[in-house]
Curated annotation (Swiss-Prot):
Quaternary structure annotation from Swiss-Prot or TrEMBL: Component of the mitochondrial ribosome large subunit (39S) which comprises a 16S rRNA and about 50 distinct proteins.
Keyword list, A-Z: Acetylation, Mitochondrion, Ribonucleoprotein, Ribosomal protein, Transit peptide
Protein name according to UniProt: Large ribosomal subunit protein mL46
Positions where N6-succinyllysine occurs in the chain: 217, 246
Keyword Transit peptide on entry: yes
Location in the cell: Mitochondrion
GO cellular component: mitochondrial large ribosomal subunit
Family membership noted in the UniProt record: Belongs to the mitochondrion-specific ribosomal protein mL46 family.
One Pfam family it belongs to: MRP-L46
GO molecular function, one term: structural constituent of ribosome
Source domain of life: Eukaryota
Modified residues (N6-acetyllysine): 228
PANTHER family in alphabetical order: 39S RIBOSOMAL PROTEIN L46, MITOCHONDRIAL PRECURSOR-RELATED (PTHR13124), LARGE RIBOSOMAL SUBUNIT PROTEIN ML46 (PTHR13124:SF12)
């Protein structure tokens, strides 16, 4: 009886030793596979800010839109109920008819402003009203550094930065720092631009696009190939961007004007996440 039990225990012990050897081997394999991941990537990480000024006025209507708007306005007038002012005008018309028929007490008319008097007053105020011009002084001068241009379009902030021996236009960007999120990097960009107290609303925590570029050959190495840039969108709420002593180093460009500044490959990636509704 003791012999079978001893053989069983001996088999269990051998099984544990084999399992231990397999576990040790797999641990060494895992440590060897994990070792390369601890080495530094040859690509730097950066966050970029796509800061947009939304439209301040609506776009002009096309002829088809004007025709449709007129049709809808006509339908609205025909199907709508009378307003308080219209009911008052109808009541005054009835009283005027009674007055002509000598069935109306004139004492009820004392110190009462008629609806027609109000309409005449409103008409005078309307004639004195002058709407603001759709075309600003910056539009006339084609001053793209001004935020007060193309009021019916989205405008995007571009800055001119020196990369190696080249001056390139791009969205504002800074290098990612260990310990911060990529959105935190984008928020840090806004903080550096906020000398003029700009406030903006970020649209989400995830990047809306990315771009990868290599450094110029003069500064490129095997351990430092280039930069991977992650874009974050934000809408400008208040403030303006002014660079003291750096005239011509920034522009507020519309979507159609981006091609005048950005490199083709960079522009292709930026246009993928831009919507101009």
């Amino acid at each position: 009886m003791a012999a079978p039990i001893g053989r069983t225990l001996l088999g269990v012990a051998k099984g544990w030793r084999q399992l231990d050897r397999l576990w040790a081997g797999s641990s060494r394999g895992l440590s060897l596979e994990a070792a390369p991941s601890s080495s530094r990537s040859p690509w730097r990480l950066s966050g970029a800010l796509c800061l947009q000024r939304p439209p301040l006025i609506t776009k002009p209507l096309t002829p088809l839109q004007e025709e449709m708007a007129g049709l809808l306005q006509q339908v609205e007038v025909e199907r709508s109920l009378y307003s308080d002012h219209e009911l008052r005008a109808l009541d005054e018309a009835q009283r005027l008819a009674k007055k002509k028929a000598d069935l109306y007490d004139e004492e009820q008319d004392q110190d009462v402003t008629l609806a027609q008097d109000l309409e005449d007053m409103w008409e005078q105020e309307f004639l004195q009203f002058r709407p603001g011009a759709r075309e600003t002084e910056a539009d006339k001068k084609n001053d793209r550094t001004s935020l007060h241009r193309k009021l019916d379009r989205n405008l995007i902030l571009l800055v001119r930065e020196k990369l190696g021996d080249q001056d390139l236009w791009m969205l504002p960007q800074v290098e990612w720092q260990p310990g911060e999120t990529l959105r935190g990097t984008a928020e840090r960009i806004l903080a550096t631009l906020s000398e003029n107290n700009m406030e903006a609303k970020f649209l989400g925590n995830a990047p809306c696009g990315h771009y990868k570029f290599k450094f110029p050959k003069a500064i490129r190495t095997e351990s430092d190939l280039g930069v991977k840039v992650f874009f974050f969108k934000a809408l400008l709420l208040t403030g303006d961007f002014v660079q003291t002593g750096k005239k011509g180093r920034h522009v507020w460009a519309s979507k159609e004007e981006l091609g005048d500044y950005l490199q083709p490959k960079y522009l292709a990636q930026v246009r993928r996440f831009l919507l101009d509704l």
